[in-house]
Amino acid sequence: GKIDPLENKTTPDDAYYGSLLSCIEMIKTGTTTFTDMHMFKNMTAKAADDAGMRAVISRGLVGEDENSGGAKRLEEAFEEMGNYKDNSRISFMLAPHAIYTCNTEYLKKIIGHAIGENIPLNIHLSETRYEVSESLKNYGKTPTEYLDSIGFFEQKTLAAHCVHLTDNDIEILAKNKVSVAANPISNLKLGNGFAPIPKLMEKGVNICIGTDSAASNNSLNLFRDMNYTALIHKGVNEEAQCVSAEEVYRFATKNGADALS
């Protein structure tokens, strides 16, 4: 791939100034609060603080409990929380990246910390068909079913993407009051499809909208993703009233605030 080699050469300064530019773009296009899963301790939080924004920050947690740097990343997550504990605009989630980058033992350790210290969880979920097929092969369950089986949703959770969901997955998300962050432009750019928003709405799932990242979107202007959210489902369902402007406005405002509060 092309991304991993570039990520490996990224420095903390790169992360800070990239995040600061992102904050400037978000402010210019009307976003005042965001959540981000990052790689470098303190850099995104510092950029958000310097820009005067509100942010819910997550250190991306990848690996295993004692190996592959997993324990170190979890330690960094708590160090960062401590550094900003007195900052009223910066708060945190615990963020295992995905089920395919964290083993079961590591996920259970993160869940234990999240429940024990009342920290919300953030994870990429069912973004690709490959992720779902690998989960079925490895666990005999969809990613959503697997996370439910290990108690992940016992703590407040924000799940990004949620493109490839079964009806049972949607029932699980609704039952556990999981918030879903749809990222339509990113999902389309990467050829992954898009979240089944009308079905999620039918079951009362809290839906919000994200831009994912500049690398997979080319823009952090949330209004673009709001527009796509409304248009995609009208076209696919051949129904002009499907996913109305009023509903999309709520996704981008109140629902997003509920997911991060």
Question: What are these language model-derived features?
Answer:
Residues 129-141, 169-174, 191-200, 217-234:
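Histidine/acidic-residue-rich catalytic or RNA/ligand-binding cores of hydrolases
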Residues 34-35, 56, 122, 158-160, ...:
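Structural detector of well-ordered beta-strand residues that form the stable sheet scaffold
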Residues 1-52, 74-86:
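Alpha-helical scaffold segments that flank or form the walls of functional sites
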Residues 43-163:
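Metal-coordinating catalytic core of metallo-dependent amide/deamination hydrolases
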Residues 149-156, 198-261:
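His/Asp/Glu-enriched, well-ordered alpha-helical/loop segment
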Residues 30, 48, 94, 124, ...:
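Divalent metal-coordination and catalytic microenvironments
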Residues 29-31, 53, 118-120, 177-178:
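A structural motif
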